């Protein structure tokens, strides 16, 4: 049980996919200007990352490995991710049309979010079992959500702050992301 807790903590804080592995930067920078959009994107990405991680494990274990089709791994994982994203988009559209409009193009772009594919491929490389794959996917999603929500809250405050003209917009956003990354480096010794 403690092994699973350590895996979750290390995935969320120590090996954060956005700040340490630099995966998922497109939605991180694109959706983080408003807190409401960031929360919606976080929920959608959490659902997609967790479910895609589980389904990718099952596809790998029960289709690719038994039939020696490892060379189709990346393509099959992208197909799994696309199906999960389409399902998520249909659910979001039915439950909250306002959220669907707020997320706009970023919801279908979860398909091309490298963090989702990265989690699926890293599960295979790390040789995680089913439960570890689910925890790793969920931990990556929680870490992504945590960073995205914190960053969007900071960007909203920065939009109202008196920032020098050369630093407005993307420049101050990148500086803030770098400072967040430094802050998360403080968790490095937390899990061995």
From Swiss-Prot:
Spans through the membrane: 5-25, 39-59, 65-85, 102-122, 134-154, 171-191
Cellular localisation: Cell inner membrane
Listed EC numbers: 7.-.-.-
Pfam families reported in the protein's UniProt record: Rnf-Nqr (PF02508)
Keyword Nucleotidyltransferase found: no
GO cellular-component term (any): plasma membrane
KW Membrane (keyword) present: yes
Membrane topology: Multi-pass membrane protein
Gene Ontology terms: biological process: electron transport chain
HAMAP family found in the cross-reference section: RsxA_RnfA
Function per UniProt: Part of a membrane-bound complex that couples electron transfer with translocation of ions across the membrane.
Oligomer and partners: The complex is composed of six subunits: RnfA, RnfB, RnfC, RnfD, RnfE and RnfG.
Name of the featured protein: Ion-translocating oxidoreductase complex subunit A
Taxonomic classification: Bacteria, Pseudomonadati, Pseudomonadota, Gammaproteobacteria, Alteromonadales
């Amino acid at each position: 049980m403690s092994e699973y807790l350590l895996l979750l903590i290390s995935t969320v804080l120590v090996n954060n996919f956005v700040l340490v592995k630099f995966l998922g930067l497109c939605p991180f920078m694109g959706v983080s200007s408003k807190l409401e959009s960031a929360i919606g994107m976080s929920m959608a990405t959490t659902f997609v990352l967790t479910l895609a991680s589980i389904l990718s494990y099952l596809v790998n274990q029960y289709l690719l490995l038994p039939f020696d089709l490892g060379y189709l791994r990346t393509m099959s994982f992208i197909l799994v991710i696309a199906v999960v994203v389409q399902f998520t988009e249909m659910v979001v559209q039915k439950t909250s049309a306002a959220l669907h409009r707020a997320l706009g193009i970023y919801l279908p772009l979860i398909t091309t979010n490298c963090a989702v594919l990265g989690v699926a491929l890293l599960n295979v490389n790390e040789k995680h079992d089913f439960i570890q794959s689910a925890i790793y996917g969920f931990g990556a999603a929680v870490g992504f959500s945590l960073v995205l929500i914190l960053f969007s809250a900071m960007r909203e405050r920065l939009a109202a702050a008196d920032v020098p003209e050369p630093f407005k917009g993307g420049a101050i956003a990148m500086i803030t992301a770098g400072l967040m990354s430094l802050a998360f480096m403080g968790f490095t010794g937390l899990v061995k």
